[in-house]
Amino acid sequence: MDSFNPTTKTQAALTAALQAASTAGNPEIRPAHLLMALLTQNDGIAAPLLEAVGVEPATVRAETQRLLDRLPQATGASTQPQLSRESLAAITTAQQLATELDDEYVSTEHVMVGLATGDSDVAKLLTGHGASPQALREAFVKVRGSARVTSPEPEATYQALQKYSTDLTARAREGKLDPVIGRDNEIRRVVQVLSRRTKNNPVLIGEPGVGKTAIVEGLAQRIVAGDVPESLRDKTIVALDLGSMVAGSKYRGEFEERLKAVLDDIKNSAGQIITFIDELHTIVGAGATGEGAMDAGNMIKPMLARGELRLVGATTLDEYRKHIEKDAALERRFQQVYVGEPSVEDTIGILRGLKDRYEVHHGVRITDSALVAAATLSDRYITARFLPDKAIDLVDEAASRLRMEIDSRPVEIDEVERLVRRLEIEEMALSKEEDEASAERLAKLRSELADQKEKLAELTTRWQNEKNAIEIVRDLKEQLEALRGESERAERDGDLAKAAELRYGRIPEVEKKLDAALPQAQAREQVMLKEEVGPDDIADVVSAWTGIPAGRLLEGETAKLLRMEDELGKRVIGQKAAVTAVSDAVRRSRAGVSDPNRPTGAFMFLGPTGVGKTELAKALADFLFDDERAMVRIDMSEYGEKHTVARLIGAPPGYVGYEAGGQLTEAVRRRPYTVVLFDEIEKAHPDVFDVLLQVLDEGRLTDGHGRTVDFRNTILILTSNLGSGGSAEQVLAAVRATFKPEFINRLDDVLIFEGLNPEELVRIVDIQLAQLGKRLAQRRLQLQVSLPAKRWLAQRGFDPVYGARPLRRLVQQAIGDQLAKMLLAGQVHDGDTVPVNVSPDADSLILG
């Protein structure tokens, strides 16, 4: 035992056996302790060894536990348990076997053979089950191959391919992969490259979410179905998991050892295995720990060039350019296969193919119109992602939302339940009272409580029945899918009798049950549970993701849009033309008749200061989002310098602020349905207008990161004071002199705001007083302003040059200042009503 040199796993097993014996109070470490320690090891080789000789590890483990339970126990022993004679003999045999096989370390498989040798209880147990020393020796040669044990962690390289990869063809055989619809050209191209003699390594390149991984899964399904050329028939596709290969590799060289073992397994398969690496760019730099260490990319290069490793990769365009193209030697070993984004029509076909899987998973029905809506709405509104991924996600989330509603208690039941609880509490309180009125109320209350309890029971029963009907349909669909998968497997394996029994016996039987259950699930008088995903559900998910109201107009919203001018006119006085133009643009958008490739509306508001240009933008944001601050406001006076254009769209690469993004593009990217106000547009540098040309015409803008930001659901408002005070012709002449024709030509409308007259100012007085009243309401104070006082404010606050802004200052000075002094002096208290009148000399206002 002097030269005993255990591997890490062997040492861990001995330590675990010692602890188990010590905890149980056993005086000796018996072979049963060692076997149990080996069987319970994570990623241990004992269980695979037993499986290789046809023994069930769970059975051996249970019988080993029974042996441990019968071992003698010593109480009060202070010494550590020692190895028993049989355990020592097993380890000696393991040491001899390691020497015989020219291994440098005693590994766990050597110990397993040692435990099966001799006449101990464990040896009899293993031999009795067929795990004789000879059988175990033959099995571990199969498991570890021709590799010698030359490191303390050899187990990491055993069955390396099984450990660090997923067999896609096996998953396809089991029916666990989603069906792949279309993509025939791309799959054919991949097959062509794989059939080459050398450099037979296709790499699928495309945007995220276009279906690169699905193409490889489609190839796996075709291999299983036999729908491939002879060169690929009966091949196995394994998806390599580089993450698990790197995970836990603590020491230098450990990752390389694991990868080498995987590559050797692939090489030894004599071309039977096709390797797939998703996110191919991760091989560049994977496992490199510093100077002198090799990364995965460099390790696989020679095998790729010789054609010993058939590798299919998948990565995005950006990652390929950034990582693979940098290494020219690696890039030339791959053949690019470009995967483009499918059209909306192709996406609908893909969704129809996946529909059954999602229906079975969520237990709800998905209508065809929902699939069409998912493809069209995702294409129009979710611009930062790609089809078919974004459309599939919409369907998945809409079905998930509906399933959640089915599993949750309906609102009707919740409301009745809360009412019953409240009535029960009231009943308990009244039952303690003895007066006549309480007794009368108690009788009425008990009658009402009985009615509500009956109603609750009825609703609960109805809900449960509806839920059960939906569950029956879901279970039958699951059965049907499982039987169809079983039938396909039987057909592939040549078991035609079983395939015929399933296809003409059990499948029609389940289909018949399903046909009978479906009308029962649908024929419900008062439906509490919705079990069908429709276009409205898809539109709701789009709205939740983007904030864009993509759903059908509800009655209340329709009425609100039809009286939009009235709502905006309450805040913006005297600008009927501008209010109508903006309202029409919003209505066109919501009714779906506006140009889908342009912004909802693009207006330039012209006119003197203080007439309501900015106020209309605020009123519009308030109308659409119930918050006047819910708009993107860009003060163009801050963009007077040429270099400030970068602040709008983001600094170019290499400049300070590149990571921050643009103030305009980032705001719209986060909230694509919004009002964008460019205030005082004439103060901006002319180059800013050039940036806005694309926004006004195409409804999109490319930011500093190269991302396209969608402006098609925004309302763009540009305000300016150009030519204020002049006639309409003079104002338009000033606009033409300042802005380029191509800029003006892209606007929907140039609206000239009229100056305010004294009558309109009286209405603005009411608005200003209402705003002051809102602030005072927090102190429960009320203002009672007389009509003469309002006229006095309108008359004194009117200035044709400055518009309505002097009026706001006047309200603040004439009322706000006096009121503040009165509050501080204690002349006015919370809850008071303060009258406001004109002074006798008509020179000021009097409060109180």
Curated annotation (Swiss-Prot):
Function: Part of a stress-induced multi-chaperone system, it is involved in the recovery of the cell from heat-induced damage, in cooperation with DnaK, DnaJ and GrpE. Acts before DnaK, in the processing of protein aggregates. Protein binding stimulates the ATPase activity; ATP hydrolysis unfolds the denatured protein aggregates, which probably helps expose new hydrophobic binding sites on the surface of ClpB-bound aggregates, contributing to the solubilization and refolding of denatured protein aggregates by DnaK.
One term under GO cellular component: peptidoglycan-based cell wall
Region (NBD1): 159-341
Designated name of the protein: Chaperone protein ClpB
UniProt domain comment: The Clp repeat (R) domain probably functions as a substrate-discriminating domain, recruiting aggregated proteins to the ClpB hexamer and/or stabilizing bound proteins. The NBD2 domain is responsible for oligomerization, whereas the NBD1 domain stabilizes the hexamer probably in an ATP-dependent manner. The movement of the coiled-coil domain is essential for ClpB ability to rescue proteins from an aggregated state, probably by pulling apart large aggregated proteins, which are bound between the coiled-coils motifs of adjacent ClpB subunits in the functional hexamer.
Region annotation (Repeat 1) ranges: 6-71
Binding residues for ATP 1: G206, E207, P208, G209, V210, G211, K212, T213
Upregulating conditions: Expressed following heat shock under control of SigH. There is another promoter.
Subcellular location(s) of the protein: Cytoplasm
Native source organism of the sequence: Mycobacterium tuberculosis (strain ATCC 25618 / H37Rv)
Residue span of region Repeat 2: 83-146
Domain Clp R span(s) in chain numbering: 1-146
The keyword ATP-binding is annotated on this UniProt entry: yes
Binding site for ATP 2: G607, P608, T609, G610, V611, G612, K613, T614
Gene: clpB
Subunit structure: Homohexamer. The oligomerization is ATP-dependent.
Coiled coil residues, start to end: 392-524
Sequence segments annotated as region (C-terminal): 756-848
Taxonomic path: Bacteria, Bacillati, Actinomycetota, Actinomycetes, Mycobacteriales
Family the entry assigns: Belongs to the ClpA/ClpB family.
Assigned keywords, A-Z: ATP-binding, Chaperone, Coiled coil, Cytoplasm, Nucleotide-binding, Repeat, Stress response
